[in-house]
Amino acid sequence: MIISINKKKARLRRAARTRFQIKKLHLIRLVVHRTSKHIYAQIIDSKNALVLTSASTVEKEILNLVKYTGNIHASICIGKKIAERALMKGIINVSFDRSGFQYHGRVKALADAARESGLKF
């Protein structure tokens, strides 16, 4: 139990450090959060603290596309969807905020799918 608390504290410390640097530069950021069953992505304007668009595996539109929401295939769908919604709003350049999670697996799949769909990090 102690190990998981320390891992979470370390992840949150990494996330805070990244967010501070991004907020200081007033960039639009693509924030990713993952749980064991779902993955969430939001595009946030750091200057005004507004969520510009979002996508997650909780949405019915995504649930119809994937069989299970906690895998790489679901992350790829979310990456494509968030890029599509961002491009519709005229957002092309974003800063990637992985929320302290390792850039591996589902987080990497989401980032790669968003890049392939037209977002620039």
Swiss-Prot record:
<dbReference type="InterPro" id="IPR004389">
    <property type="entry name" value="Ribosomal_uL18_bac-type"/>
</dbReference>
<dbReference type="GO" id="GO:0003735">
    <property type="term" value="F:structural constituent of ribosome"/>
</dbReference>
<keyword id="KW-0699">rRNA-binding</keyword>
<comment type="subunit">
    <text>Part of the 50S ribosomal subunit; part of the 5S rRNA/L5/L18/L25 subcomplex. Contacts the 5S and 23S rRNAs.</text>
</comment>
<dbReference type="InterPro" id="IPR005484">
    <property type="entry name" value="Ribosomal_uL18_bac/euk"/>
</dbReference>
<comment type="function">
    <text>This is one of the proteins that bind and probably mediate the attachment of the 5S RNA into the large ribosomal subunit, where it forms part of the central protuberance.</text>
</comment>
<protein>
    <recommendedName>
        <fullName>Large ribosomal subunit protein uL18</fullName>
    </recommendedName>
</protein>
<dbReference type="Pfam" id="PF00861">
    <property type="entry name" value="Ribosomal_L18p"/>
</dbReference>
<dbReference type="GO" id="GO:0022625">
    <property type="term" value="C:cytosolic large ribosomal subunit"/>
</dbReference>
<keyword id="KW-0689">Ribosomal protein</keyword>
<keyword id="KW-0694">RNA-binding</keyword>
<keyword id="KW-0687">Ribonucleoprotein</keyword>
<comment type="similarity">
    <text>Belongs to the universal ribosomal protein uL18 family.</text>
</comment>
<dbReference type="GO" id="GO:0006412">
    <property type="term" value="P:translation"/>
</dbReference>
<dbReference type="GO" id="GO:0008097">
    <property type="term" value="F:5S rRNA binding"/>
</dbReference>
